[in-house]
UniProtKB/Swiss-Prot annotation:
Pfam entry (one): Ribosomal_L20
One of the GO BP terms on file: ribosomal large subunit assembly
NCBIfam families for this protein: rplT_bact (TIGR01032)
GO cellular component: ribonucleoprotein complex; ribosome
Keywords from the named record: Ribonucleoprotein, Ribosomal protein, RNA-binding, rRNA-binding
Species the sequence originates in: Nitrobacter winogradskyi (strain ATCC 25391 / DSM 10237 / CIP 104748 / NCIMB 11846 / Nb-255)
Protein name: Large ribosomal subunit protein bL20
Superkingdom of the source species: Bacteria
Family (UniProt): Belongs to the bacterial ribosomal protein bL20 family.
GO MF terms, alphabetically ordered: rRNA binding; structural constituent of ribosome
The UniProt record lists the keyword Ribosomal protein: yes
Record function comment: Binds directly to 23S ribosomal RNA and is necessary for the in vitro assembly process of the 50S ribosomal subunit. It is not involved in the protein synthesizing functions of that subunit.
Length: 119
């Protein structure tokens, strides 16, 4: 059986790892053992934070809405209650965007929600 020299495949595998760790500092970018560990950990962080990103953005939208409805004399929870009572089914992402970019439209929605609470 012929001897198999693995230099080419090993080099290709190492290149793949180094491509992931490009921009890392210290040994983590250019020593294969440390680079593999760093690349694995980076993948774990990426997986975890793709899930966390959804929570973080929802929290941001809620904070923005809470700040936007305070001038209308409501809290966030009362605003959401008013929206559901008035039958407005707009999600928090769109409401947050409206509050920032279309204040007049958001004001109309907030007043409808407030009217639904009073009724």
């Amino acid at each position: 059986m012929a001897r198999v020299k693995r230099g080419v495949t090993a080099h290709a595998k190492h290149k793949k790892v180094y491509k992931v760790t490009k921009g890392f500092s210290g040994r983590r970018k250019n020593t294969i053992r440390a680079a593999k560990a760093a690349a694995d950990k980076a993948g774990q962080y990426a997986f975890r934070d793709r899930k966390r990103k959804k929570r973080t953005f929802r929290a941001l939208w809620i904070q923005r809405l809470n700040a936007a409805v305070r001038p209308f004399g409501m809290t966030y929870s009362r605003f959401i209650d008013g929206l559901s009572k008035s039958g407005i089914t707009v999600d928090r992402k769109v409401l947050s965007d409206l509050a920032i970019n279309e204040p007049a439209a958001f004001q109309a929605i907030a007043e409808k929600a407030k009217a639904a609470l009073a009724a």
